[in-house]
A protein has these predicted regions:
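Bacterial N-terminal signal peptides that target proteins for export
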Residues: 1-9
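Acidic/histidine-rich catalytic neighborhood
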Residues: 228-229, 235-273
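Short, structured active-site-proximal loop/turn typified by the sulfatase FGly-forming signature C/S-X-P-X-R
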Residues: 40-84
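A long, amphipathic alpha-helix that forms part
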Residues: 158-173, 188-229, 373
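Active-site neighborhoods of enzymes that stabilize oxyanions during catalysis
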Residues: 262-372
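His/Asp/Glu-rich, glycine-adjacent segments
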Residues: 79-196, 325
Length: 400
């Protein structure tokens, strides 16, 4: 009898392990690039407002620097840039001399730059299915693997926003639906850069993605899947106004023999390996209004920007609304500043069967998103920097 019982248990375990995940709740994580936390206060966003009143809302404090690639990879891994390796949109690899750049397909797709474990790999490692649309880093073979469904951002034309939404609905309707769907949308960042955060074009972009999201959710509900989907909406950073009169030129203050390379203008990583070079730079910039400069060892701890070897020997950080560059500039929107500047903070909304209703979380670190999504998926997170931040919101945000 005991032997028969044990055989039945073994068979049951095998059956459960091979059973498709049809009926399991799916988490859909959507990112709207450059969606400032307070855009819903200025523009007409009825769906995000509905999510706020019937779900969980808050604002995300980005990780430093408040740039697209570093923060999307933070959202995906729960690690700050100093720990996950993507320390800026462009930087130097000290070991090889190679320059990582979003415009360089060779380095952008080099997995050696990407540390930590992104959500799609954490989910796959624990037996879940994943589909990812253009999320930064998802087209890179990190640890030799990519999501089950992925799209190469370098291949043009990209899927339109409507096509991405159509695909999400289609995948949710499959019997073997993905357990995790992640989708990246370039707006309102593109409009914010071109026209500024208060421009009518940016307003239209904000309202358009809200309408897109409303349509997506309506289709999910019409298909009878509303009770099976947890929807989480995030952004990587906010946006503030810049005008060329606020440009600070490095050439006005720095001699070329003081550094090997300047990477970025907001912030600027200065590669100056000799101590005398570093001291010369910091001294020359000490009295310049509207910027701060530190040797790497002196970067303020709250920025969490010291651990990675590829961080510059000197960091130059302009005040909000200023740039440190010699190149051409134009009126428009910018980001990359201290993450505690209000205009840099980003939108957060979440609702679904596993999330509470009518909850305001206030400001929260964006490192909490990774462990939050892992919890919604019922999987164990990899090592990350967001556990403490997640514990602060867990009881408020989650049903269980």
């Amino acid at each position: 009898m005991l032997k028969r019982t044990l055989l039945c248990l073994v068979a049951l375990v095998a059956l459960l392990a091979s059973t498709p995940s049809y009926g399991r709740k799916t988490t859909v994580l959507v990112s709207f690039d450059g969606f400032r936390w307070d855009y819903p206060s200025y523009y007409d966003t009825p769906f995000l407002d509905r999510m706020a009143s019937h779900g969980v809302e808050g604002s995300l404090i980005p990780s430093f620097p408040s740039k697209t690639f570093p923060n999307h990879y933070t959202l995906a891994t729960g690690l700050r840039p100093e720990h996950h390796g993507i320390i800026a949109n462009s930087f130097l690899d000290r070991a090889t001399g190679a320059k990582f750049s979003l415009g360089n397909p060779k380095t952008k797709s080099d997995p050696s730059f990407y540390h930590g474990e992104p959500l799609w790999l954490t989910a796959q490692r624990q037996g879940l299915r994943t589909a990812v649309f253009y999320w930064p880093g998802s087209d890179v073979a990190i640890s030799g693997k990519r999501p089950d469904v992925w799209h190469d951002y370098g291949e043009k034309p990209h899927m339109t926003f409507a096509q991405r939404a159509d695909s999400i609905v289609a995948y949710l309707g499959k019997k073997a639906a993905p357990d995790l769907i992640m989708a990246y949308f370039e707006e309102p960042d593109a409009s914010g850069h071109s026209f500024g955060p208060q421009a009518k074009e940016t307003r239209r972009a904000v309202e358009a993605v809200d309408s897109l999201l409303a349509s997506l959710w309506a289709r999910i509900e019409r298909a009878g899947m509303g009770g099976k989907v947890n929807l989480v909406v995030v952004s990587d950073h906010g946006m503030t106004w810049f005008t060329p009169s606020r440009k600070i030129k490095p050439s006005d203050y720095l001699r070329k023999e003081w550094y090997d390379a300047l990477e970025g203008n907001l912030p600027c990583n200065v590669y100056a390996p000799e101590r005398w070079q570093q001291d010369s730079i910091v001294k020359a910039l000490a009295g310049v209004p509207h910027l701060r400069a530190w040797r790497k060892a002196d970067i303020p701890r709250y920025l969490h920007y010291q651990a990675d070897a590829n961080i510059g020997d000197v960091l130059v950080l302009p005040d909000e609304g200023y740039l440190f560059c010699d190149g051409d500039t134009y009126d428009g929107g910018v980001h990359g500043y201290d993450p505690y500047c209000g205009d840099m903070q980003a939108v957060f909304r979440a609702w679904g069967p596993d999330l509470r209703q009518g909850v305001s979380l206030g400001k929260m670190s964006n490192t909490a998103v990774y462990p939050l999504v892992c919890h919604l998926l019922g999987i164990k997170p990899a090592a990350n920097d967001g556990e403490e931040a997640f514990e602060e919101i867990k009881g408020k945000a989650l049903v269980k």
